[in-house]
C-alpha cells in the first residue's frame, strides 16, 4: 500500500511532457527489481541445495551431522548477503557435529584426506562451505543474478566489490539492484537523447 502511494506521488511529480518516459522508466525499474529478486531466489536455492548435498556427502564418511535440511536452508537464506552467505550455515553444522560426536573416538581422530587431523570433521565442514562459497561467488551469483538483470557476470563481481569496499556488507547487499536501476536510467537517458525530437 505504501509503495503504491509513493508510486502515485512520484507519477504526479512528472511533468506532462515527460509522462510517457517517466512511466516507462518506473515500469522498467520495477521489472529490473523483480528480475533481480527472482535471480536471488534461484541463487539462494542453489546454495541451499549445494550445502545440503555437501553435508550429505560428509555424513557418508561418518560426520553424523543432523538437521542438514535446516542448515542448508539457513545457508541459502543467508546467501542474500553476497560473498559471505554460505558461511552462515557453517556455524550450526560445526556445533551439531561436535554435539553428535562427543565420545566418538572415530570422529575425534578423523583425518581429512586421511592425512590432516580434523577432529569431529570440523575442517571437512569448513572446507565444504568454502567450496560452496567459491562456487556461489564465481558462478552462481554472477551468472544467475547477473543474467536476471542483464549484467555481465564480470560486471556483477566488480559491482559487488565496489559496494563492499564503499559500504561493507550492506553495500554488497544493495550493489546489484542499484546497478540494475542505474542501467535502466542510463538506458532511458540514451533513448531520450536519440529521440528528443519526438518529445
Q: Where are each of the predicted segments found?
A:
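Hydrophobic alpha-helical transmembrane segments of membrane transport and translocation systems
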Residues: 104-105, 111-199
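Alpha-helical transmembrane segments and their immediate interhelical loop/hinge regions
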Residues: 1-96
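Detector for methionine-enriched segments
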Residues: 25, 83, 90, 99, ...
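Juxtamembrane/interface motifs at transmembrane-helix termini
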Residues: 27-29, 40-45, 57, 92, ...
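A short hydrophobic/aromatic micro-motif that marks alpha-helical segments and, especially, helix-coil
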Residues: 16-18, 30, 97-100, 165-167, ...
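Active-site activation/catalytic loop segments of kinase-like enzymes and analogous catalytic loops
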Residues: 95-108
Amino acid at each position: 500500500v505504501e509503495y503504491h502511494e509513493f508510486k502515485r506521488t512520484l507519477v504526479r511529480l512528472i511533468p506532462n511532457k515527460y509522462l510517457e518516459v517517466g512511466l516507462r522508466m518506473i515500469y522498467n525499474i520495477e521489472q529490473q527489481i523483480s528480475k533481480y529478486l527472482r535471480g536471488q531466489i534461484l541463487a539462494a536455492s542453489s546454495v541451499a541445495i549445494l550445502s545440503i548435498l555437501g553435508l550429505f556427502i560428509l555424513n557418508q564418511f561418518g560426520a553424523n551431522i543432523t538437521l542438514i535440511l535446516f542448515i542448508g536452508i539457513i545457508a541459502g537464506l543467508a546467501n542474500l548477503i553476497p560473498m559471505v552467505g554460505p558461511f552462515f550455515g557453517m556455524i550450526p553444522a560445526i556445533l551439531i557435529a561436535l554435539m553428535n560426536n562427543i565420545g566418538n573416538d572415530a570422529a575425534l581422530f578423523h583425518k581429512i584426506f586421511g592425512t590432516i587431523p580434523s577432529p569431529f570433521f570440523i575442517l571437512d565442514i569448513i572446507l565444504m562451505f568454502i567450496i560452496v562459497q567459491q562456487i556461489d561467488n564465481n558462478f552462481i551469483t554472477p551468472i544467475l543474478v547477473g543474467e536476471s538483470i542483464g549484467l555481465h557476470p564480470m560486471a556483477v563481481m566488480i559491482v559487488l566489490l565496489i559496494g563492499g569496499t564503499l559500504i561493507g556488507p550492506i553495500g554488497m547487499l544493495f550493489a546489484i539492484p542499484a546497478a540494475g536501476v542505474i542501467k535502466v536510467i542510463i538506458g532511458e537517458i540514451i533513448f531520450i537523447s536519440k529521440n528528443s525530437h519526438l518529445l
